[in-house]
UniProtKB/Swiss-Prot annotation:
Xref: SUPFAM superfamilies: Ras GEF
Motif SH3-binding: chain residues: 281-292, 451-462, 538-549, 606-617
CC annotations in GO: cytoplasm; cytosol; early endosome; intracellular membrane-bounded organelle; plasma membrane
Positions carrying Phosphoserine: S281, S293, S314, S335, S360
Comp. bias regions, Polar residues: 484-494
Keyword Transferase listed: no
Gene: RAPGEF1
Annotated protein name in UniProt: Rap guanine nucleotide exchange factor 1
Alphabetized SMART domains for the sequence: RasGEF, RasGEFN
Primary role: Guanine nucleotide-releasing protein that binds to SH3 domain of CRK and GRB2/ASH. Transduces signals from CRK to activate RAS. Involved in cell branching and adhesion mediated by BCAR1-CRK-RAPGEF1 signaling and activation of RAP1. Plays a role in the establishment of basal endothelial barrier function. Plays a role in nerve growth factor (NGF)-induced sustained activation of Rap1 and neurite outgrowth.
Cellular compartment(s): Early endosome
Length: 1077
């Protein structure tokens, strides 16, 4: 009996503890005349039936008393963890909001500094990317709360304002800006303010949504009156009384009623779920951007816990302090955030809040009279229109000192702060009602805070600006593109995504530059504009002719080129695993790692739909929604008939009929692997070459987008390497964009993966563009795609694509400035520090290799392919530079030898170069090896008298370039080397030319992919060698001695010296090699 009495006593004490923890919930229980139960009320209990307990519980199982104690401890621990997690989330939000404000302040600083320093303009695109990267974590915050319509609408506004900011910076990058245009300054301030308003609203709503479950999920406790009767409980011990007294502080601190003394009056009704009404608290202010919508009731739910006060217990105090700190930040967020980033806000009780609220009118009037100065001791929390984060919009940051010294748009970390002024910004946040326009920034009078800005004057300026822009060919209006958060169906969104049909622009038109005026616009990237013909159009042609001489001289070693066997170029590359690793790495870098799976992963995701009949059924409505059958009619996306004449010319009448019969199905919309394979021409059994022998350009593209199939890695690489031979990069980008936008709006997992794989191919196409291919049209096309991605909320994809674009623009700018930053040795003004004998042969070989490698790694694969097709060195600048370096080195070697007056000196130098060639062979540098060999074996040097041992040694080295069996010796040596290696590109160019001239581009109207596979195989070794780099130190003494090989004689001068040393009428002994030839 003592055991039962003790157990009943402990159970009663536990219930008292639980009542203390849940006392606020008891007080919320509606009761018309009853009072909340007093703490000292004795709660009777049923005696514990020990026999029943032993019957149903196994031996050693915790008794119900232990379970109750564990429940109390678990509830306390979970409350601490929940509040701690909430505090972490709010601190994280506060930190990310700081980063956005810092990024916007940095962007504004760059804009302000453009007026006084044109070089700062180069940092503008990078600063816009910083804003994008700062906002990206906020929109990826908590997927569980993104189902809210309020948050979805807020996301859409953030995306649209961010897209406008990025578009403005991109247009400035392309077209320049008139820095003295006042309307431009006002416009960009409105764009920045719109982004900041959207982010502020997003953070506020996120706090409300995250804070709702904790304070607004009441668990209805059982009423004390409903508890069964039982024997009187034992008196409490001193320790138990002390514990109960300590819990009193927490029960009072967690009280949610506005008046702590008024506990007898219960509310007439229980509060609605998720809504709390706090009496005598200041009403929440309406968000300026949502005038037409009702204020969110959740604002009060976050402000209400501000009435909690601290008390004395250890564990309850810890819980209360965490919750109090969280709610202090929530109160500052909802009341304007004046102390979000500095200082500690005074802790307010409901009564003190009322008292301070009564003083807010006087303080507001004093703020209006005193230029917005506000002391931290006043209740700035109650002013909805004050936020120090907006101060930088009213400041002139052109004199800010903390500008990072970075080149172009280097995405380096942001500066901590650029300084804040003491004059706060008074007025409502930037407001853009539906179809409205931004107001000019500046302090507003109290009467103007709720007035709607006049739309008619803004529309007049907008129309005039549009006329000006239309006349100049610049697009300045911003459309609102459909978003995934709009209340429209997936099919409607899919049909409107590529072609926006919104008749109005909710954001103001942004003018990146102003035509006319007194001040000239700041130029930025002049390479993207069409060159003006200032002279006679007959003058440019001779320049490529001169460069062709260098290319022909480079390939003189291959005068006896014989046709190799076609099977030589059909072999499967041995570096397939390298391409697989590269593909997987790129997917991880770009964020597509989840798309890389096994061979049959596509079929496992979803059953293949019957696409051909489905497409015929959807054709008529698709045309109404803006998707015609031919993708060429969609915003310039080319169809099958938009290719150049070289494709249409070989087509036979039968091929044309078959092509017309296939036009019923849009091949760019196919997603079934079996359907795709049925439209490809596959190889027959026993044939050499790739599995895919041909197909239309569209179906080859669609097949290349199946990047999640490991068996197609080599095919994708071959397509990306050779697509320029049958379609231009601009046309390919348009087709990929069309395919991506066709499937991206769908929520279906399989179609989402198709769109993701398509975008991955598009990013790779952009990443592998040559600098000469980066035209203004392609840049505008890609920047428009970035704008669409941001509007649709695809910030991660937009970030990846934008980074690639800016990297390409940066490389082109550096290439333009390369000639002006060359060292003195490259300009031919450095003096030679000695002779060739002053340096060791292996040291000279290493420095020759470093110079070759620097130029070799700059060559882009498409340059080599385009030269073999078009013989146009203007499109292959890096290849041209590499070949000129080879020729200059060869003539430099000839000149050094021929300028020696004594035969012994000439012999000594020739032996020196033979030793250098030996070390070059060990370094696998075939380029410099053959450059020196071509010099020593040239006619002006070979005709002179040499020692027999020297001539025989030189002949041994010449066997490497023996032309018999299509240069079998060199091909064998090249296949045996291990990277790093610098090959002789002359043979690669000759092979590509042979394949191009010996195979048709099209067979029966379809792209001959077998030809492209041969070209890919030829370029495979070069691509592999470019991946491995040399690890050697640069020796400036030797580099300066080379002097960029600019000090050499022309071929005519070399012949004159050779004839002077040995006239024609003097015979000499022929070597064994000469007798054979």
């Amino acid at each position: 009996m003592d055991t039962d009495s003790q157990r009943s006593h402990l159970s009663s004490f536990t219930m008292k503890l639980m009542d203390k923890f849940h006392s606020p919930k008891i007080k919320r229980t509606p009761s018309k005349k009853g009072k909340p139960a007093e703490v000292s009320v004795k709660i009777p209990e049923k005696p514990v039936n020990k026999e029943a307990t032993d019957r149903f519980l196994p031996e050693g199982y915790p008794l119900p008393l232990d379970l109750e104690q564990q429940a109390v401890e678990f509830m306390s621990t979970s409350a601490v963890a929940s509040r701690s997690q909430r505090q972490k989330n709010l601190s994280w939000l506060e930190e990310k909001e700081k980063e956005v404000v810092s990024a916007l302040r940095y962007f504004k600083t760059i804009v302000d500094k453009m007026a006084i320093d044109k070089k700062v303009l180069e940092m503008l695109p990078g600063s816009a990317s910083k804003v994008l990267e700062a906002i990206l974590p906020l929109v990826q915050n908590d997927p569980r709360i993104q189902h809210s319509s309020a948050l979805s609408s807020c996301y859409s506004r953030v995306y649209q304002s961010l897209a406008n900011l990025i578009r403005w910076s991109d247009q400035v990058m392309l077209e320049g800006v008139n820095s003295e245009d006042k309307e431009m300054v006002t416009t960009v301030k409105g764009v920045i303010k719109a982004v900041l308003d959207g982010v502020k609203e997003l953070v506020r709503l996120t706090i409300e949504k995250q804070g709702r479950p904790s304070p607004t999920s009441p668990v209805k406790p059982s009423s004390p009156a409903s508890k069964p009767d039982g024997p009187a409980e034992l008196p409490l011990t001193d320790r138990e009384v002390e514990i109960l007294n300590k819990t009193t502080g927490m029960s009072q601190s967690t009280e949610l009623l506005p008046d702590a003394t008024d506990e007898e009056v219960a509310p007439p009704k229980p509060p609605l779920p998720g809504i709390r009404v706090v009496d005598n608290s200041p009403p929440p202010a309406l968000p300026p951007k949502k005038r037409q919508s009702a204020p969110s009731p959740t604002r009060v739910a976050v402000v209400a816990p501000m009435s909690r006060a601290t008390s004395g217990s250890s564990l309850p105090v810890g819980i209360n302090r965490q919750d109090f700190d969280v709610d202090c930040y929530a109160q500052r967020r909802l009341s304007g955030g004046s102390h979000s980033y500095g200082g500690e806000s005074p802790r307010l009780s409901p009564c003190s809040s009322i008292g301070k609220l009564s003083k807010s009118d006087e303080q507001l009037s004093s703020l209006d009279r005193d230029s917005g100065q506000c002391s931290r001791n006043t209740s700035c929390e109650t002013l909805d229109h004050y936020d120090p984060d907006y101060e930088f919009l009213q400041q002139d940051l052109s004199n800010a000192d903390q500008i990072p010294q970075q080149t172009a748009w280097n995405l380096s970390p942001l500066p901590e702060s650029l300084g804040e002024s003491g004059s706060p910004f008074l007025g409502p946040p930037f407001q853009l009602p539906l179809g409205g326009h931004p107001q000019p920034d500046g302090p507003l009078a109290p009467g103007q805070q709720t007035d709607t800005p006049p739309a008619l004057p803004e529309k007049k300026r907008r129309s005039a600006a549009s006329q000006t822009a239309d006349g100049s060919g610049c697009r300045v209006s911003y459309e609102r593109h459909p978003s995934q958060y709009d209340n429209i169906s997936g099919e409607d969104l899919q049909s409107t995504a590529p072609i926006p049909s919104v008749p109005y622009a909710p954001f103001a038109a942004i003018l990146p530059f102003q035509h006319g005026g007194s001040s000239a616009p700041v130029e930025f990237v002049g390479d993207f504009t069409a060159p003006e013909s200032t002279g006679d159009p007959e003058k440019p042609p001779p320049l490529p002719e001169k460069k062709n001489k260098h290319m022909l001289a480079y390939m003189q070693l291959l005068e006896d080129y014989s046709e190799p066997q076609p099977s030589m170029f059909y072999q499967t590359p041995q570096n397939e695993h390298i391409y697989q690793q590269k593909n997987k790495l790129l997917m991880e870098v770009y964020g597509f790692s989840d798309s890389f799976s096994g061979v049959d992963s596509v079929q496992e995701l979803a059953p293949p739909p019957a696409l051909p009949p489905k497409q015929r059924q959807l054709e008529p409505p698709a045309g109404k929604d803006g998707h015609p059958r031919d993708p060429s009619a969609v915003s310039g996306v080319p169809g099958k008939d938009s290719r150049d004449g070289s494709e249409r010319a070989p087509k036979s009448p039968d091929a044309l009929e078959s092509a017309q019969s296939e036009e019923e199905v849009d091949e760019l919309s196919l997603i079934d692997h079996n359907e795709i394979m049925s439209r490809l021409t596959l190889k027959q059994e026993g044939d050499d070459g790739p599995d895919v022998r041909g197909g239309s350009g569209d179906i080859l593209l669609v097949h290349a987008t199946e990047t999640d199939r490991k068996d197609l890695v080599l095919y994708c690489e071959a397509f990306l390497t050779t697509y320029r031979t049958f379609i231009s990069p601009e046309e390919l980008i348009k087709k990929l964009q069309y395919r991506y936008e066709k499937f991206s709006p769908f929520a279906d997992t399989f179609k989402k993966r198709v769109s993701k794989n398509t975008f991955f191919v598009l990013v790779r196409v952009v990443d592998e563009l040559c600098l000469v291919e980066l035209t203004e049209e392609i840049l505008k096309l890609l920047m428009e795609l970035v704008f669409r991605l941001v509007c649709n909320g695809e910030l991660s994809l937009a970030r990846v694509l934008r980074k690639n674009i800016l990297d390409k623009v940066d490389q082109k700018k550096l290439l333009r400035c390369a000639t002006s930053s060359q060292p003195l040795a490259a300009r031919g003004v450095a003096a030679r520090p000695g002779t060739l004998h002053d340096f060791h042969s292996h040291e000279i070989a290493e420095q020759l290799t470093l110079l070759d490698a620097e130029l070799f790694y700059k060559i882009e694969i498409p340059e080599v392919l385009l030269w073999a097709k078009e013989q146009n060195e203007e499109k292959s600048p890096n290849l041209t530079q590499f070949t000129e370096h080879f020729n200059n080195m060869s003539y430099w070697v000839r000149s050094i030898i021929m300028l020696q007056e004594k035969a012994q000196d000439r012999e000594r130098l020739l032996l020196k170069f033979i030793k250098i060639m030996k070390h070059l062979r060990k370094l696998n540098n075939f380029n410099s090896y053959l450059a020196i060999l071509s010099a020593l074996d040239s006619a002006p040097i070979r005709r002179l008298e040499w020692q027999k041992q020297t001539s025989e040694g030189l002949a041994e080295y010449c066997t490497l370039i023996d032309s018999s069996s299509s240069f079998r010796a060199y091909r064998a040596a090249l296949s045996e080397v291990e990277p790093p290696c610098i090959p002789y590109l002359g043979l690669i160019l000759q092979d590509l030319t042979f394949v191009h001239l010996g195979n048709p581009d099209y067979i029966d109207g379809k792209v001959n992919f077998s030809k492209r596979w041969q070209q890919f195989n030829i370029l495979d070794s070069m691509r592999c060698f470019q991946q491995a780099h040399y690890d050697m130190r640069r020796n400036d003494d030797i580099i300066n001695f080379f002097n960029d090989f600019s000090d050499h004689l022309a071929e005519e001068a070399l012949w004159e010296l050779s004839l002077k040393i040995k006239p024609r009428n003097i015979t000499r002994r022929k070597t064994d090699r000469e007798e054979k030839t």
